[in-house]
């Protein structure tokens, strides 16, 4: 069975939605393509414009750009090591095993606020206001600044209780780290499900079907 999702909720600009639908349905014409190309700005540098995130096709490209931007900051660096207990496959780590930050670093939250205060959500962009060996304060674009606490993720295994026929959860391991990652750049793949106010798309090395569409629809 094939299910087609036809309504775009992430974007509200009717003209842009029309362009996205035309790309998705492979019916874009020269007029729509010209409208899209109006957003092509040769020589645009995200270093000169605050709050932009670069969407890249490959992990190493995003990592190199983030490392470059972090190294350019004059403030001291602090590294936070994740606390891993029990069985937790490294390939499934939900956050950085080693998170290095400086004051002024652009970061993205990678999960929703668990405190119930709604201070941040998965994909929200902010900047590190202060950082010490034991404290991180992030200021977001809406002006709110707050202490960020470490989050814990569980690696769970599910089994069927033969007696009750109920599914039971068994936690095999846990991963504890600050729910942040450097966010001057991320991969298009990791941007799926997220929405950004300002983005620059670097899709010159795109390799997967639909990759450019995913980037444009962020």
Which residues are covered by each model-predicted region?
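Conserved helicase motor core of P-loop NTPases
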Residues: 1-118, 125-129
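C-terminal accessory regions
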Residues: 108-218
């Amino acid at each position: 069975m094939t299910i087609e999702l036809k309504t775009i909720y992430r974007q509200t600009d009717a003209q842009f939605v029309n362009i996205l639908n035309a790309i998705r349905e492979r019916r874009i014409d020269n007029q729509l393509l010209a409208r899209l190309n109006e957003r092509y700005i040769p020589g645009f540098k995200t270093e000169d414009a605050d709050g932009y995130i670069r969407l890249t096709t490959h992990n190493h490209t995003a990592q190199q750009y983030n490392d470059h931007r972090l190294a350019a900051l004059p403030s001291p660096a602090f590294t936070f090591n994740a606390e891993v207990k029990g069985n937790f496959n490294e390939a499934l780590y939900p956050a950085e095993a080693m998170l290095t930050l400086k004051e002024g670093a652009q970061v993205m939250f990678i999960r929703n606020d668990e405190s119930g205060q709604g201070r941040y959500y998965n994909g929200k962009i902010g900047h590190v206001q202060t950082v010490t060996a034991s404290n991180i304060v992030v200021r977001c674009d809406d002006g709110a600044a707050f202490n960020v606490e470490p989050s814990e993720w569980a690696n769970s295994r599910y089994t069927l209780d033969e007696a009750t026929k109920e599914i039971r959860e068994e936690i095999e391991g846990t991963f504890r780290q600050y729910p942040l990652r450097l966010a001057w750049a991320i991969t298009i793949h990791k941007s799926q499900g997220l929405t950004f106010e300002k983005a620059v798309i670097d899709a010159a090395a795109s390799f997967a079907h639909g990759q450019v569409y995913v980037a444009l629809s962020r």
